[in-house]
Curated annotation (Swiss-Prot):
The lineage of its organism: Bacteria, Pseudomonadati, Pseudomonadota, Alphaproteobacteria, Hyphomicrobiales. InterPro entries: DNA_gyrase_inhibitor_YacG (IPR005584), Znf_NHR/GATA (IPR013088). Gene3D superfamilies: Erythroid Transcription Factor GATA-1, subunit A. GO terms for molecular function: DNA topoisomerase type II (double strand cut, ATP-hydrolyzing) inhibitor activity; zinc ion binding. This is DNA gyrase inhibitor YacG. Inhibits all the catalytic activities of DNA gyrase by preventing its interaction with DNA. Acts by binding directly to the C-terminal domain of GyrB, which probably disrupts DNA binding by the gyrase. It holds the Pfam family YacG. Binds 1 zinc ion. Its cofactor is Zn(2+). Interacts with GyrB. It comes from Brucella melitensis biotype 1 (strain ATCC 23456 / CCUG 17765 / NCTC 10094 / 16M).
């Protein structure tokens, strides 16, 4: 049977990803990544809250 999507390396450890935890290799790596988002280790760049552009009003 052909896989639904290609196997890619886990972004945390580099092992091949699994279908159950895609794009990660395991629930452990998935939880490590989630913890990094929740703790603020990962951020998406943007304006700080409260700053409005003059054109937004």
């Amino acid at each position: 049977m052909t896989p639904l999507r290609p196997t890619r390396p886990c972004p945390e450890c580099g092992k091949p990803s699994t279908r159950e935890a895609y794009p990660f290799c395991s629930p452990r790596c998935k939880n490590i990544d989630l913890n990094r988002w929740l703790s603020g280790s990962y951020v998406i760049a943007g304006k700080p809250l409260g700053e409005e552009d003059e054109n937004d009003s």
